[in-house]
Amino acid sequence: MIIKCIAVDDEPLALDIIKDYISQVPFLKLIKTFNDGISVLEYLASNNVDLIFLDIEMGGLSGTQLLKTLQKKPKVIMTTAYRNYAVDAFDLDVTDYLLKPFSFERFLKAVEKSCNSLNEAQNDHNQPKSDKDYFFVKSGYKILKVNFDDI
């Protein structure tokens, strides 16, 4: 499975490190990089990605503000130099939180977590749905039909 990703950071050096790390992971495909949140919103309005590497502190629209505005959220790995945003980030359902500077090993662990989450979501989506909206229960000598809506 190839994971399409974008990277967002207003610091060129941090973006270069993320790009280098992504290039070392064969199942990651970097689609585009951004240095501000507004450009990301415009891009995501007409493009789909599986994973975003997202800085928090950026001029204009912050990473957390960006996440709050997204209707359909891809998996997100926060990349930041600030510890104090971790709780807020996890409240926004990010997959992981990388504290700069982070090692390739730590980066890879976050990517694997995102990959597992994406695989689980895909497997759930591919599971056949039951067309029954009820089940049977034996009660004494009787078999009762119970509707899911009645539970």
Segments and roles (model prediction):
Residues 27-30, 150:
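Glycine-centered tight turns that cap/initiate beta-strands
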